[in-house]
Amino acid sequence: MSPSSVALLAAVVIVVMGGAAEAANTKFVSASCNTEKIARGSPFFNNLRDAIEDLRQNTAYIGYDYKTSHVGSGGAPTAYGRAICKQSISQSNCTSCLSNVATRIYGICGNAIGARVQLTDCYMQYEQRSF
C-alpha cells in the first residue's frame, strides 16, 4: 500500500471512530422517593406525567439542565420537574438516558408524590412543590 493510501485509510478510521457516539451510561446511582402517594389517573398524576414527558423531550435542547412546571387544572396541584444530563453526552443520548430514567422513576418510586432518580449520565426529579 502506498504511503498516501495508508494516510487516507488512517484518516477514514479516525473520522469513523471519532464520529461514533458512545451510548449514554444508564447505570443506576441513587433514588429518593417521597412516602406520600398519589392516585394514578388523578389530575395531579396527569400533570406529573406531562411534566416528565416535557423533561424527557426538551432537556437535551435547552442546555442539558431544564426545569418545568405543569399547572393543575380544576384545582389540581402543579407538578414541578427538573432533568439534567452530563454535558459530555450527545443530545440523542441525553434524551435516551432521560427516557430510561423516566421509566425507572415510576418503577422505583411508584406513585410517590415526589421522586429523584440519578443515573450515571442523567438525573430526573419531580415534586408537588417548587424547588
Curated annotation (Swiss-Prot):
Keyword Signal (UniProt): yes
Organism superkingdom: Eukaryota
Signal keyword on record: yes
Keywords: Antibiotic, Antimicrobial, Disulfide bond, Fungicide, Lectin, Mannose-binding, Plant defense, Signal
The Gnk2-homologous domain, residue ranges: 26-131
One BP annotation, GO: defense response to fungus
Disulfide bond residue pairs: C33-C109, C85-C94, C97-C122
Stretch forming the signal peptide: 1-23
GO MF terms held by the record: D-mannose binding
Any Pfam family the entry gives: Stress-antifung
Entry's transmembrane regions: none
Binding positions (alpha-D-mannopyranose): N34, R116, E127
Function comment: Exerts antifungal activity through its carbohydrate-binding specificity.
PANTHER family in the record: ANTIFUNGAL PROTEIN GINKBILOBIN-2-LIKE (PTHR32080), GNK2-HOMOLOGOUS DOMAIN-CONTAINING PROTEIN (PTHR32080:SF54)
Name of the protein described by the UniProt record: Antifungal protein ginkbilobin-like protein 2
